[in-house]
């Protein structure tokens, strides 16, 4: 059966994850990713399209993947106490990335650039690895990362690709296979925030402080505390620090105010994962108060390759049941509900000053929200890969 003369069919807008497999895979380069009014990237077909149908063929939304066997679940933490102490969770991502780099491989993951925009980059040495560490709950622009992954694989190098489950699925669809030298790690994600809204936050912080924000830690811990904090460092040494739940960014993420529409019906919120390994949150239940304070990660082993890599990592580990894992991380069982105010929020963004919109929709949490366990649970799961925080 040929793909010729097949009209280009892309995922319905409300289901499109923005994985960019179609854009990377178009043999004519006739698809580009364009931001919409909410700041999310969507594929746009240009006049260069020859209607080969390849984009339809590789779209993860339009072509369902085969289910996998039930994963094994482990509570893990890095054997290096310094790394663990300065990590968002247990330092598992650091161990995995260093394992690949030490073997001469390349690590792909989400990073913040000088303008605090989130995009996927390739890291080839330990010196640059901190760029990939830490939580980034804003949707990452994968750019041409899938093409770069193929290039490094063709050169015979091992590659680790980390990202949301839809990005990992998009990579596999683009490649059309599961190469032996490719290791994938998806994160149990509760949704990705709007890059457009995040850009407005960055501009707002710069205006209020009258100085450029240089770095952001979305889910930091101070002095080994388990409370997640939103921390910003500015160019003249000024800082902003608050519990994530008390920051406008955290409130918006927790309320599902500016997540990508497809996230609210996400088909990846289950234990049937796309990566060889899955990083999840483990903040209660099967862990002790001391483990919660120091930080541990929940790791799912989804494939034989994932098990082989896991056995090589310098991680302390303890087996837990899959039921405990699902109970610990909401992203393994259901999508994030959409806010009833979401449409009004984005309508207001087009008509009113940003600070005015924040005051109306992202003000202090209502008592029922502040006390609700589901909200706290959600805040623990909105992220990209775990990892080491930069020391202050």
State each model region's role.
Residues 1-6, 48-155, 321, 325-341, ...:
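Flanking helices and flexible, charged tails adjoining ferredoxin-like Fe-S electron-transfer domains
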Residues 6-16, 41, 46-50, 156-159, ...:
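Immediate flanking context of iron-sulfur cluster ligation sites
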Residues 88-91, 114, 161-171, 191-193:
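Gly/Ser/Thr-rich loops at beta-strand to alpha-helix junctions
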């Amino acid at each position: 059966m040929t793909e010729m003369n097949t009209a280009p069919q892309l995922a319905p807008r409300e289901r499109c994850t923005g994985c960019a497999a179609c854009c990377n895979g178009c043999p004519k380069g006739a698809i580009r990713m364009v931001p919409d009014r909410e700041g999310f990237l969507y594929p746009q077909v240009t006049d260069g399209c020859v209607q080969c149908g390849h984009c339809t063929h590789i779209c993860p939304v339009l072509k369902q993947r085969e289910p996998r066997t039930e994963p094994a679940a482990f509570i893990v933490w890095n054997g290096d106490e310094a790394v663990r102490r300065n990590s968002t969770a247990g330092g598992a991502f650091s161990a995995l990335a260093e394992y690949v780099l030490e073997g001469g491989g390349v690590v792909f993951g989400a990073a913040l650039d000088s303008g605090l925009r989130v995009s996927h980059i390739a890291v080839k040495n330990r010196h640059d690895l901190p760029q990939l560490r830490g939580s980034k709950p804003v949707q990452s622009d994968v750019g041409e990362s899938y093409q770069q992954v193929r290039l490094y694989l063709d050169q015979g190098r091992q590659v680790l690709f980390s990202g949301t489950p839809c990005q990992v699925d998009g990579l596999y669809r683009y490649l059309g296979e599961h190469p032996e030298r490719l290791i994938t790690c998806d994160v149990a994600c509760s949704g990705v925030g709007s890059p457009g809204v995040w850009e407005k936050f960055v501009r707002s912080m710069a205006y209020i402080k009258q100085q450029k924000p240089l770095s952001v830690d979305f889910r930091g811990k101070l002095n080994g505390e388990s409370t997640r904090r939103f921390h910003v460092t500015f160019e003249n040494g000024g800082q902003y620090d608050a519990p994530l739940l008390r920051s406008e960014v955290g409130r918006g993420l927790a309320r599902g105010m500016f997540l990508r529409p497809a996230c609210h019906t996400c088909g990846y919120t289950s234990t049937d994962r796309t990566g060889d390994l899955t990083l999840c949150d483990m903040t209660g239940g099967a862990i002790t108060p001391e483990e919660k304070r120091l930080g541990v990660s929940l790791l799912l082993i989804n494939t034989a390759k994932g098990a082989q890599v896991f056995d090589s990592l310098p991680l302390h580990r303890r087996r837990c049941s899959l039921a405990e894992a699902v109970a610990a991380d909401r992203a393994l069982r259901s999508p994030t509900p959409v806010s009833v105010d979401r449409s009004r929020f984005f309508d207001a963004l087009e008509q009113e000053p940003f600070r005015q919109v924040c005051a109306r929709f992202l003000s202090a949490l209502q008592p029922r929200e502040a006390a609700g366990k589901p909200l706290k649970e959600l805040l623990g799961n909105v992220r990209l890969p775990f990892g080491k925080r930069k020391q202050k």
